[in-house]
Structure formats: C-alpha cells, structure tokens
Amino acid sequence: MKMFKSLSLLPRIVSPFQKCYSTDLISLVGIPRVKITKGQNRYLLVNIHTHGFTKYGRVIVRGADVDNHLTVFDSILEELEPQGICAKILGGGRILNEADSKKIKIYGTSRTFGSADHTRTRNILHSWTTYKDFKITVKN
C-alpha cells in the first residue's frame, strides 16, 4: 500500500518538468524558419535552441538588406533573447530574392561568420510554403 501512495506522488513530481520542456519546445516551433526581404539580402543560417538544450535545436534563415552580417545578427538577438532562446551562427552569404519572377539565388560568404551551407538554406526555403514554387539556385 505504501508503494501505491508513493506512486500517486509521481504526477506531481513529473508535471513541472513536463511543462518546462513542452513550453520551451513550443517557443522554438513558434519562431518562423524563414524571414528574408525582397531584393538582395545578406543572410545568416542560424541554429536556435533553448538555453541548456542544444540537442533540440532548429535551423532558421534570416536575411535583410543591410550593410553587414552583424546587423542581421543583432536583429536575430533582439527577436530571440526576450524569449530565452539562444542562437549559434552556422554561416552566412547573400540571397537575391526576385519575388516577381519567383527566382532566388543563394551565393557568397560572410566575412564575419564564414560561408553557410547554401544547399541546406535552399532546402529550408523550399520547405517554407511561401518559396515552395520558386526556382532556387545555389552558387558556391
């Protein structure tokens, strides 16, 4: 009988951990995988994760028409830090987004963060519904 009483305490012990992990994962899923503007962008390929849980990350693409990749990185931090999400830059480059003709060209490298895996970036863009029908070319 004592064993059943101790087992009845199990949900009380597990519940706080379950809530903690599930809310962290929900906050990751709520972040859009792609944010780029029309025209020429400097972009970063970023692995995001909740603090302490690097194993359960997600790769996102962020780009903007700015002077350098550090400005893109600063905007990423402004977006993610209030939610307690950490970012690790995997590399960068440029994206030419011709939305009218449904073409995207991924090329170049970031002097600050090194070159991103452009093929991986292309796959992420293709998985996003906005860019599913676009012709995406990669130039290394």
From Swiss-Prot:
InterPro entries given in the database record: Janus, Janus_sf
Residues annotated as catalytic: H69 (proton acceptor)
Function recorded in the entry: JanA and janB regulate somatic sex differentiation.
Molecular functions per Gene Ontology: protein histidine phosphatase activity
GN (gene name): janB
Entry keywords, A to Z: Differentiation, Sexual differentiation
Assigned protein family: Belongs to the janus family.
GO BP, sorted A to Z: cell differentiation; sex differentiation
Signal sequence residues: none
Protein name stated in the entry: Sex-regulated protein janus-B
GO cellular component, one term: cytosol
UniProt key word GTP-binding: no
Highest taxon listed in the record's lineage: Eukaryota
SUPFAM superfamilies: PHP14-like
UniProt binding sites for substrate: R42, S110, R111, T112
